[in-house]
Amino acid sequence: MSSEVETSEGVDESEKNSMAPEKENHTKMADLSELLKEGTKEAHDRAENTQFVKDFLKGNIKKELFKLATTALYFTYSALEEEMDRNKDHPAFAPLYFPTELHRKAALIKDMKYFFGENWEEQVKCSEAAQKYVDRIHYVGQNEPELLVAHAYTRYMGDLSGGQVLKKVAQRALKLPSTGEGTQFYLFEHVDNAQQFKQFYRARMNALDLNLKTKERIVEEANKAFEYNMQIFSELDQAGSMLARETLEDGLPVHDGKGDIRKCPFYAAQPDKGTLGGSNCPFQTTVAVLRKPSLQLILAASVALVAGLLAWYYM
């Protein structure tokens, strides 16, 4: 008689015990939250390493560029929340519908008013990259609403994860009010604990009645969402290269080529600040050079070329 005790199905106890962890791991990997986490890791890493995101996290952001990014977010969330409202009763999405806790459009409108004024809608338009993202969201909401999960997951979970960090970076780099004007997007007033809410949201995702094929399609759609975001970042990088860095209001005074040279930031950085005689202010040199008519003509031609390229890019 065998020393191993067999079960009624003919599987001995040792084999049954060895299969238990495998079954548990398979169940875990079948969870939509785990599939999304693993299936979008590469795209997530690439998005985090785009130049725009790296510059933002370093506080190297111009206000005009931040305004363009806020505009892109406004159009993106307007589309996403319109489609979420449309599908709030759809069984594949209804358990993830939390307008009070998550919706960002109202907060973004406040930010747009702060940056552009009351007539902000007359001043902004959806960029080419953002429009592609918006079009995709509308298509999904109207034709494949089960895939809305991918876009909600990509946007809201990311906002809850890094929102407070980005808010502080923006406030510090752009000298925005600590009272929240201009950064309402990052404030989730009705979420007391972001980590707990994310866990709750993931549990709701995992409870959705979806087959494995649909889950795989959601992962694929989430990767598309990351790609659309990266296209917007790339567009912002291009726009940023055309914008002059905004001078902070409390920065060092700029020497105008006249008067006390010690007001020049270049001079202030020199180790031998006690002697004026040997100092050469680059601002003075630049002003003198640009006063030459021939170089003024070259500069004007260069500006015209850049303007022409910009016009072509935005056509």
Swiss-Prot record:
Topological domains, Cytoplasmic: 2-294
HRM repeat boundaries on the chain: 263-268, 280-285
Catalysed reactions listed for this entry: heme b + 3 reduced [NADPH--hemoprotein reductase] + 3 O2 = biliverdin IXalpha + CO + Fe(2+) + 3 oxidized [NADPH--hemoprotein reductase] + 3 H2O + H(+)
Keywords of this entry: Acetylation, Endoplasmic reticulum, Heme, Iron, Membrane, Metal-binding, Microsome, Oxidoreductase, Phosphoprotein, Repeat, S-nitrosylation, Transmembrane, Transmembrane helix
Modified residues annotated as N-acetylserine in this record: S2
Any one Gene Ontology molecular-function term assigned to this protein's record: metal ion binding
Post-translational modification: A soluble form arises by proteolytic removal of the membrane anchor. S-nitrosylated by BLVRB.
Organs and tissues of expression: Ubiquitous.
Organism superkingdom: Eukaryota
Biased composition (Basic and acidic residues): 13-28
Family statement: Belongs to the heme oxygenase family.
Listed name of the protein: Heme oxygenase 2
Native source organism of the sequence: Mus musculus
Gene: Hmox2
